[in-house]
Amino acid sequence: MNGKEIVITGLGVVSPIANELNLFWEGIKSGKSGISRVESMEDIDQFPVQIAGEIRNLDIEKYMDSKEARKVDPFTAYGVAAASMAVEDAGLDKFSFDQERAGVLVSSGIGGMKYLQTQHKRALEGGPKRVSPQLIPQMITNILAGYISVSYTHLRAHETSP
């Protein structure tokens, strides 16, 4: 950073505990766990560990077009939802950002794992030619920062940090 202040003006959360900030905070304070038996995998019984923190009850169409939501990995959809919640929490207009003063920073170790799993299955069943050319773009973590940036009047400053 160059010594300038950063201001966080709004918060958004997509979590196994809750997908609304006030419910999430109440859950944290009360010690609620978001860990439970995995419901999103048909073959979960094959695995020795069958618990995880899954996102449930998120109406993604509140935050992005349903057609677009089907194209992107849940990692991206969840990030867009959380960013939208943060903008709303801040009381900001989606299209009123000063491109010179606003930016996006995403920190994540890895991105689109569900997309990777889907493409791995396609490769095993049909060979490498069945793998989507979107595999790498959907997996890399900076897809989310870029997607959010484009969604909000093409913010110039967008980064991804491990």
Task: Show where each model-derived region lies.
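Acidic-glycine-rich active-site phosphate/pyrophosphate-binding loop
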Residues: 51-58, 118, 139-152
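Solvent-exposed alpha-helices and their adjacent loops that cap or buttress functional pockets
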Residues: 1-2, 95-99, 128-129, 141, ...
